[in-house]
């Protein structure tokens, strides 16, 4: 269904409620440049990593899994038997995920705050456009938990909206992104109203800050495997 949520001001902060869940897939595709390409790219790196590190039944966590799109991409690229666990604190999102993946016997979903979850040892984790919604003071705590639960040679994928450390470049990047959204059919008002709703809810870091954060919790190998203006996909490997 087409995202028309921001035709008028919501007069409240953005949250992942039933109204958002109803149009979320359209919102993602029209708001994140190369969204599905990044999912496929992330699935590729996890699939290749699993080939290099054979486990009996690899466990993969998708934190902030929303409507389950990444699990679809993973199942298209990974042939071996895997266990997929999606965690999200929005029940409306998980209902959508369960509907879409009802035929996927290897996927299960849990409605929980992933900051409070005790993870099992896993071959891979994904945080796709999620860390930006975690309070800055809690990001290092979460990433350290992930690092400690990641198997040796395991991989973490982090997709993020980012900012530039240069004020002028940041302004130009934002303007280009708004032009992209207009080309996707969003009006000036819709863009402004959504920006207003996301104020202090989505807090982006720079690319350098995100990489430094991952390195601070123990990752020695972090690569930006994709970047478009103010969006990036990072792959971090535990060695």
Swiss-Prot record:
Q: EC? A: 2.1.3.-
Write out the GO MF terms.
carboxyl- or carbamoyltransferase activity; S-adenosyl-L-methionine binding
Q: Which reaction does it catalyse?
A: prephenate + S-adenosyl-L-methionine = carboxy-S-adenosyl-L-methionine + 3-phenylpyruvate + H2O
Enumerate the UniProt keywords alphabetically. S-adenosyl-L-methionine, Transferase
Some GO term, biological process aspect, for this entry: which one?
A: tRNA wobble uridine modification
Which CDD domains does the protein's record reference?
Answer: AdoMet_MTases
Query: A Pfam family name for this chain?
Result: Methyltransf_25
Q: Which PANTHER family does the entry mention?
A: CARBOXY-S-ADENOSYL-L-METHIONINE SYNTHASE (PTHR43861:SF2), TRANS-ACONITATE 2-METHYLTRANSFERASE-RELATED (PTHR43861)
Which family is annotated? Belongs to the class I-like SAM-binding methyltransferase superfamily. Cx-SAM synthase family.
Describe the subunit structure: Homodimer.
Q: Which HAMAP family match?
A: Cx_SAM_synthase
This one is known as Carboxy-S-adenosyl-L-methionine synthase
Q: Where does this protein come from, organism-wise?
A: Helicobacter pylori (strain G27)
Per UniProt, what is the name of the gene that codes for the protein in this document?
A: cmoA
């Amino acid at each position: 269904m087409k995202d028309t949520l921001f035709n008028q001001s919501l007069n409240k902060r953005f949250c992942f409620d039933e109204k958002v869940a109803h149009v979320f897939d359209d919102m993602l595709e029209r708001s994140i440049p190369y969204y599905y390409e990044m999912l496929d790219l992330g699935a590729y790196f996890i699939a290749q990593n699993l080939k290099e590190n054979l486990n009996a039944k690899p466990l993969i966590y998708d934190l902030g899994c929303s409507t389950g799109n990444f699990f679809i991409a993973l199942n298209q690229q990974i042939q071996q038997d895997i266990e997929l666990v999606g965690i999200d604190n929005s029940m409306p999102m998980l209902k959508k995920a369960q509907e879409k993946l009802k035929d996927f016997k290897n996927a299960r979903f849990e409605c929980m705050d992933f900051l409070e979850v005790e993870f099992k040892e896993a071959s891979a984790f994904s945080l796709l456009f999620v860390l930006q919604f975690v309070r800055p003071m809690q990001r290092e705590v979460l990433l350290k938990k992930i690092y400690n639960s990641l198997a040796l040679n395991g991989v973490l994928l982090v997709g993020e909206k980012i900012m530039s450390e240069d004020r002028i470049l940041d302004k130009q990047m934002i303007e280009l992104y708004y032009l992209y959204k207009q080309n996707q059919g969003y009006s000036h008002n819709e863009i402004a109203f959504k920006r207003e709703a996301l104020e202090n809810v989505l807090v982006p870091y720079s690319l350098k800050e995100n990489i430094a954060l991952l390195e601070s919790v123990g990752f020695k190998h972090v690569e930006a495997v994709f970047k478009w203006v103010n969006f990036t996909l990072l792959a971090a490997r535990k060695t």
